[in-house]
């Protein structure tokens, strides 16, 4: 689904002070940002239209969404507790480690089984993110999936 040209993200920046991670994690970050900017639905509730820039960071163990317009006007800052994400992210890390090992040496059926589990946990995290942003930011599921990937990248780095 192509989103309205104004109800979308045009730029996403992750907190660079946390540093870099493994090549696999950095690849996940790059792909998520590329896919997110290609197609997304992102509408801060109560704001007439973007496109928007998102600065995503971790501050004092909280997830911070700083949103501005493409022109730089601040729109909103939303701060979310990480508590609802901790178990999901931990499970996701563990299954991703298994997945990265499997793609190097496992059979296709083993890789597929691990990937199905990975996708299921990723979907759970994406839905949790949508629920936590409900009433603050309207997004579609694909946008939530890509944003959840970036939340995981911040965890990995932090």
From Swiss-Prot:
Q: Which domain of life is it from?
A: Bacteria
- Pfam families, alphabetized: UPF0262
Q: Which cysteines are joined by disulfide bonds?
A: none
Give the matching InterPro entries.
Answer: UCP032146
The record's listing under NCBIfam families reads: PRK02853.1 (NF002769)
Report the sequence similarity comment from the record: Belongs to the UPF0262 family.
- From the Swiss-Prot or TrEMBL record, give the protein name: UPF0262 protein R00612
Q: What is the lineage of its organism?
A: Bacteria, Pseudomonadati, Pseudomonadota, Alphaproteobacteria, Hyphomicrobiales
């Amino acid at each position: 689904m192509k989103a309205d040209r104004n109800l979308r993200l045009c730029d996403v920046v992750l907190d660079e002070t946390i540093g870099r991670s493994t090549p696999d994690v950095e690849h996940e970050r790059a792909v998520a940002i590329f896919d997110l900017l290609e197609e997304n639905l992102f509408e801060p509730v109560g704001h007439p239209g973007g496109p928007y820039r998102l600065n995503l960071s971790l501050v004092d163990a909280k997830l911070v969404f700083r949103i501005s317009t493409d022109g730089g006007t601040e729109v909103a800052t939303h701060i979310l507790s990480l508590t609802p994400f901790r178990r999901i992210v931990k499970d996701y890390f563990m299954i991703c480690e298994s997945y990265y090992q499997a793609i190097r040496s496992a059979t296709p059926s083993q890789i597929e089984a691990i990937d199905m589990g990975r996708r299921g946990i990723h979907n759970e995290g994406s839905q949790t993110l949508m629920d936590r942003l409900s009433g603050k930011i309207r997004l579609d599921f694909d946008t939530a999936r890509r944003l959840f990937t970036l939340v995981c990248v911040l965890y990995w780095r932090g």
